[in-house]
């Protein structure tokens, strides 16, 4: 149903929204239509990228590692810590405990999503974006660490709410940093 609604919205929008030709757009906005942008390759753009791009890229690189590992190993971690499954056993993934833990991981990911939505509402309240981003990543790191030490399935909600805080910042803040670091016209779109 959701996909059908999305497709209908896209069809409606593309059929109803008419774009101005470039010359008419330039006249309407009092732009010099004769000015041509120089076309540069992506390697040149990377060489001229602001330092913020590289800093954020490095942080994102390591942040995404954490989430890739989480998506891969959460079932086993929750099964071992909360259901007592011996993950070194050859049949660990076929045990009832592992299956129940796998089901519970779905609940934990839902809790993470809720934490992410709530934190996304809080993020704009910070005066410093860098502080908000750093704090979010530290809160998320605390959540990741806590998962190794919690042995109650309901207490696992706490680290996953914290991980959700990091997730909200990882998705929103880098785009803000990089777009604000771009200078001039023609870098976007």
Features from the language model and the residues they span:
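Intracellular loop-helix junctions on the cytosolic face of multi-pass helical membrane proteins
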Residues: 1-69
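Short hydrophobic/alpha-helical segments at membrane-entry points of transmembrane helices
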Residues: 55-56, 154-160
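Helix-loop boundary and gating motifs at the non-cytosolic
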Residues: 55-59, 63-91
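Loop-to-transmembrane helix entry
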Residues: 82-113, 155-158
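Loop-to-transmembrane helix entry/capping segments in MFS-fold secondary transporters
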Residues: 102, 184-189
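Helix-to-loop junctions at the C-terminal end of transmembrane segments
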Residues: 116-130
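C-terminal ends and interior cores of transmembrane alpha-helices
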Residues: 138-151
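Intracellular juxtamembrane helix-capping segments at the cytosolic ends
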Residues: 169-186
